Amino acid sequence: MTASTTRRTTAAKSRIAAAGAIAVAGAMLLTACGDQTDSGKKDSAASADTNKAPLFDQLPKAIQDKGVVKVGSDIAYAPVEFKDKSGKTVGIDPDLADALGKQLGVKFEFENGTFDTLVTGLRAKRYDIAMSAMTDTKDRQEGVEDGKKVGEGVDFVDYYTAGVSIYTQKGKDQGIKTWDDLCGKKIVVQRATVSEDLAKDQAKKCPAGKKLAIESFDNDQQAQVRLRSGGADAGSSDSPIAAYAVKTSGGGNDFELVGDTVEAAPYGIAVAKDNKELSAALQAAMNAIIKNGEYGKVLAKWGAESGAVTEAKLNGGS
């Protein structure tokens, strides 16, 4: 979203014989345009001056002026962010964003994108932040992907802790309890996630003749569909997402969790490295809602209290 600008148009020349009349008309037109511009500046200043949100002053001026934080998110990852039956974006992240907005005095607008393009969109300034159950890792902080430097990294405002879980069709766990048990089987995952990374690492460890087949999808819902139809032996996703799928898919009759949750790590709100002011404002706002209880209420609403943190930190991932 960009700030609105005053459109200036040139009026058609009047057929006025007297030069003095033309000069007067021109002066009036210039005066009118000048009034519009001054009024716009005053309105913007008045909006900033009258915003009573406790942390509004900590935001970058560009965010203050537009009154909106554009959020890149893969809105297909229940219960963190997803579309309800009416098409509304709901979940842990949207609810937390609403609470952050009250502290900062701006709106958070979610824009849907595939998970593996969110950081790219952040670098390209399509989004102000990425908030999408994104695990804070050193590689992402440093702009490293598959061992290669792909661009400038991002900063993270950490706000939740999640691990990685494996799940299977209900009653068909095939003896799967650990990642080693996946050798010789097929797993479905979402592309560019920690689950995909773990699956790739495990595939390298499997012996010849018992290779782990990996099928990656743009979103987790597609992976669940494949597993539900019998197209794979197991699926993997972040622990709150896997638990939610087990609880809700098919009324709780489609999937079951197997083995232990591994690789506990923080979720973080991703912010461009050159936007330290926004990172600091978001950290302050997150700590404010942790302190006032809004944070806990959101997690309780979605049954996600187990991953709660007591403090929002910057770049706490490893």
Regions inferred by a protein language model and the residue ranges of each:
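Alpha-to-beta junction loops
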Residues: 70, 106-107, 124-136, 185-188, ...
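Extracytoplasmic small-molecule ligand-binding "clamshell" domains
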Residues: 43-134
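A ligand-binding cleft/hinge motif common to bilobed small-molecule-binding domains
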Residues: 134-149, 200-201, 205, 228-263
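Periplasmic-binding protein-like
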Residues: 158-168, 247-284, 305-318
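Bilobed "Venus flytrap"/periplasmic-binding protein-like clamshell domains
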Residues: 89-103, 162-219, 234, 239-243
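Bacterial lipoprotein signal-peptidase II cleavage site
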Residues: 30-45
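Acidic, polar ligand-binding/catalytic clefts
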Residues: 107-179
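Extended ligand-binding regions for polar small-molecule ligands
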Residues: 34, 95-98, 102-103, 170-173, ...
